Amino acid sequence: MTEKRVEQLESRVNDLECQLAFQEQTIEELNEALSQQQMLITRMQDQMKFVVGKVKNMDGSNLADASEETPPPHY
């Protein structure tokens, strides 16, 4: 191989190594973001289950019967 060809190959290898390093960093950052989002989704699902449970356990005794309601002022 000629000296020029060896330099070209070394340059290409260096470029590929740089690209690989950046890709590895990007993958790590994406993995961290995904992990945080999954934790947030899990927390939100737990909160939603809690709220749904509260709503299901509410009784209608706080609501007045329609016949007991006073008519609105424009009546």
From Swiss-Prot:
One Pfam family this sequence matches: SlyX
Source taxon at top rank: Bacteria
Disulphide bond pairs: none
Family under the similarity heading: Belongs to the SlyX family.
Record HAMAP family: SlyX (MF_00715)
Official protein name in the record: Protein SlyX homolog
